[in-house]
């Protein structure tokens, strides 16, 4: 991938040396070296397919790749020949080796897998990651920026297994709602009786108007074109 870049660097060096030799009065300035950690010029991506596109988004770090791979495999095993599966993985440190392994294992004619580095968006943010969570839990919040050219997308946590065609979920009508999710009955039960600390967290930290409407964010249908107007104020 870098061969053309190496050639360009060396050819430019030769040409610049030639210019200096030919014109002793040439004005130029040499500055210190600069290294870029991320060279992604634009986080916006386009749909992988022109028709029957089913966009599915995951977020993961390199440590979670084995679990992520199981989730990806479950999506691919249950796919239909009638649709194209546009899988996007939001990440910041998955190794090239692991990316290659995943693509080699799962890429097919109607499955596209792409890795998008969104780490730079969160680099200067002092975000809280309690207990066993990592910063990747926030990555879903930039989907409306990364996927501006998508109407509707599915977000899935990496620690689940899909046992049916994910296209069925994508086709679920959600009316005028921006997000579709499932109510978290476990949290509702904890809030009501079993976990006083959960009740305090919901009331004092989250300040939820209706704690019993708390939902599980591990499976979401999101309308990206509309969410763009709401989410940026949360993280920027």
Positions of PLM-derived features:
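Glycosyltransferase catalytic domains, chiefly GT-A lineage
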Residues: 18-21, 38-236
């Amino acid at each position: 991938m870098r061969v053309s870049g190496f050639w360009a660097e060396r050819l430019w060096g030769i040409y610049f040396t030639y210019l200096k030799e030919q014109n002793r009065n040439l004005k130029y300035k040499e500055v210190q070296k600069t290294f870029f950690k991320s060279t992604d010029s634009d986080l916006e991506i386009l749909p992988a397919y022109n028709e029957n596109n089913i966009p599915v988004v995951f977020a993961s770090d390199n440590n979670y790749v084995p679990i992520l791979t199981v989730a990806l495999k479950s999506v691919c095993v249950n796919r239909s020949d009638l649709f194209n599966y546009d899988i996007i993985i939001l990440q910041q440190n998955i190794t090239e080796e692991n990316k290659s392994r995943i693509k080699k294992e799962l890429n097919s004619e109607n499955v596209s897998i792409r890795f998008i580095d969104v780490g730079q968006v969160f680099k200067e943010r002092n975000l809280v990651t309690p207990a066993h969570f990592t910063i990747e839990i926030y990555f879903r919040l930039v989907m409306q920026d990364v996927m501006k050219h998508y109407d509707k997308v599915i977000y899935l946590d990496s620690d689940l297994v899909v046992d049916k065609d994910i296209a069925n979920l994508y086709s679920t009508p959600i009316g005028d709602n921006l997000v579709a999710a499932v109510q978290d009955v476990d949290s509702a039960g904890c809030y009501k009786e079993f976990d006083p600390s959960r009740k305090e967290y919901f009331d004092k930290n989250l300040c939820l108007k209706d704690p019993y409407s708390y939902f599980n964010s591990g499976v979401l249908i999101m309308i990206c074109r509309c969410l763009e107007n709401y989410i940026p104020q949360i993280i920027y």
